[in-house]
Curated annotation (Swiss-Prot):
InterPro entries: G_GB1_RHD3_dom, P-loop_NTPase, RHD3/Sey1, Sey1/RHD3-like_3HB. The gene is SEY1. Disulfide bonds: none annotated. GO terms for cellular component: endoplasmic reticulum membrane. It is a multi-pass membrane protein. One of its GO terms (molecular function) is GTP binding. Its main location: endoplasmic reticulum. Residues 47-277 form the GB1/RHD3-type G domain. This is Protein SEY1. Residues 1-733, 779-848 are cytoplasmic. Belongs to the TRAFAC class dynamin-like GTPase superfamily. GB1/RHD3 GTPase family. RHD3 subfamily. It is found in: Endoplasmic reticulum membrane.
Amino acid sequence: MNGNFAAVGSEPTDAQFEHGIQVIDEDKQYNGLVNDYLRRTHVAEAGFNYHLISVFGSQSTGKSTLLNNLFGTEFSVMSESERRQTTKGIWMSKNKREGKMAENILVMDVEGTDGRERGEDQDFERKSALFALATSEVLIVNIWEHQVGLYQGANMGLLKTVFEVNLQLFLKDKQSSPRSLLFFVIRDHIGNTPLSNLRNTLVQDLTKIWSSISKPPALENAKIEDYFDFAFAALPHKILQPEKFVTEVENLGTRFVAGHRSTQDQEFVGGVFLPEYHRRIPADGFSIYAEGIWDQIVNNKDLDLPTQQELLAQFRCDEISRDVLNAFDEAITPLEDKQAEASRLGKPFVLPDLGDTARSARSKAVEAFKVQASRYHKGVYTRKQAELEGKMDSRLKALYQGQLAAAHKAGVAAFSDAVTGAVKAGQKSGGSYEFAEIVDKQKRKTLDIFAKEAQGLEIEGLAWTNFKPQFLLFEKELDEVSARLRKDEMRRLATRVERWVKSRLGDSIGLEFNKLGSGRGGSGAPETGEKPATEKDLWDRIWTVFVAVVKEAQERFAERAKSFEASSEEVEIGLWRLRRKSWVALRERIDEEVMEGNILLKLRENFEDKFRYDEAGVPRIWRPTDDIEGIYTRARESTLTLIPLLSRFRLAETYASPDLPGWIGNQPPGVEPDDEEDLTPIGGIDEEEGKSLEEEMTVLSESKRQDLVVRFKKTADGVYVEAKRGALGGMTQVPLYFWIALFAFGWNEIWMVIRNPFLFILLLLSAGGTYVAYNLSLLGPMMQMTNAAANQASEIGKQKLREFLENNETARQALAMPASSKSSGGEQVRMDTLDSKGKKKDYDDDGI
């Protein structure tokens, strides 16, 4: 047995203490000389400055080899040729490599589990593992890579029992929760599976077994993280990769130093020895403390092994459960895949006949398990059946929730589309439709479809398949959608009414402004004295027309809103918005009327009616004797008085602006930001916009008024000059003696023309044509065409004569012309080469 180690029951020598001491032997006896060993290794006087590490794992997995290479100890290792147990009981030795590690590290080598020497007697391995867990700061779990994910191979079954008893014996009555570190060292790691994946698998397994253990009453909700931290490391194969193994072991050794937690992510900073792991037992009292722990473990009856009957029942029930779950998977997995695909695409998909399929698959699985497993241990059977039903129900619950979510989403979309379609159909038909009736009908239809789907998913005896809360939630959302659709329809109604208001105002306001152009006396407008109603009361009439139009629009809106079952608050908000938008429409129409071109035209018409027509409305024919200047001055000044009148929206009766804030009213309660975002600010009402009521009522600014006066005066001056020229032009006449002389000297010619019918008719036609051409301003173009035709004819004649002389030998000799080298064709005279006077243009001028 371990050479140079002090065994239980013998008085050790210094040489035997050299490599450690056997704390507990294979017969479960505690060694009372542990304190002597601590004194001889100078650990007893270290106080709290020491650390205890234990190793845990299956037999012959290299636990002792790991400790020897890591801490420089000399625990006995297995002979490869014999493959038998080497470590018996629990041995302890002090770390020999303190250069890169913390001081006073005590290492306990625990007998391996699942050894053939003890066979089915697992009592000692459980108790030794529990002792190591209860006393050590760090418990190294030594496993091979291929054991990760196994239940027995990874010692998960043993850890489950150890966790449960440790919780009951040592933690249930303590106010604080002592923590330990489970340090998993994964041996023979080849790297195909990343360490992070192995870590996730182990953490999931540990969490699962922790959730399944029996906990004391005060610790039902305790989590494994409340008592344990986890660390992980991987080592290569010692035989196949010896150099890499040594390097990784050295790197692993650097982690066994003091450390602390990060304040941000609670990860280790420094080493693995955290202060909360220490049991706070002085080193000189550790031996007594450990002996008490071992005594409590040995004498505890809760550590007895379960009966073989229970083990058999557990094995068979697990096996049967896997078989029935396979059949359950065949029915449910395709449905889960379809639902997942629809969720990935973002499209709601209601699985057909999900309720019947799920009920059938679940009932078949439960019945098959009952038939095969009910003959085994009743307690185990009942527990395993509950586990089986829990697994199936958890999957069905997720599937059902996805189904109802899809039905919910599809139902809401269908409801919205149906209501919108019915409203559009009513609008296209031109008839009236009741929005509230449409909503109520479609809502009942949609709720019936959802209720039918939810009832189809119900499974008898399972309370969680009662989906009344989901139904109420669906109904609530339909109400919200109904409210939103009603609000949208109210907005559309308001838009239609606003368009009607704009149309009415456009005609009515335009008519009132057109009256400004009717200033002639025949219309009843005197040139002096009080202004007629068509001018002085302009704004009164506009305000009266505006109020009447908006009142009618409000009645239309309120009457139509009743069919929507809109609340009085919603109607009041709609009327308030309508009044605001109507005023903005009026201002826009007024601004359009007083645009520079429009208002100047109306002022000119007003002036001309007063200037060109007399008191009876008869057009004036100006004579040099008329008082043109006086009439012009009175008409101009009368028209100029309209500009101040138009510059401000002011009632003649009160000589003040209308009470716009009172007419629009205060903002009703319940107005949301969406109701205000499309509203134009109004001066005197929206004070935060910085525009006063006086500015709101100003139609023409001072600069525009002055500019309008200047432009109008120029226009009026032009009319005056035209009238003056017309009066003076009538004074230019042909003398009478000229006509007498013309008639006397031309009598013979006149009589000749009259007596000759041909000349007389030609004279009439020429005179008539000349008169028409003169009135149509065609005399100039006709003269140009005649001149062009004459010039063209002259050019063509010259060209033809030249060709004749060139081609005729006799004529050429008579004129002594030289023979021509040009072809007979010559240069052609074309109409498109003539200028406006009929002259031939040079080709260079045409750019050819």
